Amino acid sequence: MENKEIVQPWGWELPSTSPFSRTPSRPQHRQPEDFDRKFDSRTIIYDAFYLPERNELRIIGPPFLNLHAMATGVVAISGGETLPVLVQELDRHMRITVQLQGRPDHVVLQSQMGDIRVPITEADQKAFAGKRVLLTLSKNNRLEWICDWIRFHHDHHGANAVLLYDNNSTLYTLHELASAIANVPGIDATRVIHWPYKYGPQGHGGGFWDSDFCQSGALEDARWRYLQPARSVLNVDIDELVLPRHSLCLNWWRQRPPATSRFGDSGWSRRTAVTTAYVQNPSHCCIEVTLYG
């Protein structure tokens, strides 16, 4: 399978000499001991890409939080002209949209944080056109486990493409990962995205899911840079095998109009005869789900 590619997104972080940094929104008494080490205080941009059909530059990153006032005052310059800018703070991520005039080779964002020269790289809208895509963020999951996960969802849900954001794995190279995925029968397209950013602190005491920016940013990036023309997208973790109670996801989706669908598990996970044939990972579980519109 030749349709595989490793992608290095263009990102930007505040230099170590900058007087500015992102500060947490979580109260200090709700921060565990390792919170500061895991918190991403300096990354401003995860990725930037050009959407030709909209003539827009999309910039994805963590939420600005305390830097929001600076961000809303950002100015975009190209060829000496000032361009319209829309800054949106979303759930654990942000999106900047710059309306372009023509297609320059770069845009300069000017703010109190400094000048940022953003290159214009076109979004990949062809690789997953018409595909049923498996989407995930992964770090150091064993290659055989990843391949098990792909085979299961190919056989049971018709997945024929994989978009995997690798969160700086150390057990293998990006090339080894991409090659392993590409060798799974039935997979027509593979993109492995180098996503080296801090994952962020988890929730605390069943709440405060406010600082794990990395995954939300990856999903936003995937949505706009790669998945607009996809036929369907299934986003689950590597240790999750989705087994609906009453029908295959593929058949269920075919009977419904285009939409985003969610599923909830039964409150517990287990292994079944169906999933056991696929898994070499003893911690792999079947998530028994109910599908909703």
PLM ranges: what are they?
Residues 2-124:
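Beta-strand-enriched, solvent-exposed domains that form extended recognition/catalytic surfaces
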Residues 136-151, 167-168:
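Active-site beta-to-alpha loop of glycosyltransferases that engages the nucleotide-sugar donor
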Residues 121-124, 132-133, 170-235:
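Active-site-proximal specificity loops/subdomain of glycosyltransferases
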Residues 140-142, 169-171, 240-243, 268:
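Short acidic, S/G/P-rich loop/turn micro-motifs used as interaction or catalytic elements
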Residues 163-166, 190-197, 262-266:
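A generic structural motif
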Residues 105-108, 161-178:
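Carboxylate/His-rich catalytic cores and anion/metal-binding grooves
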Residues 151-160:
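Short, acidic, metal-binding catalytic loop of nucleotide-sugar glycosyltransferases
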Residues 199-215, 223-225, 234-236, 242-293:
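Conserved catalytic core of nucleotide-sugar-dependent glycosyltransferases
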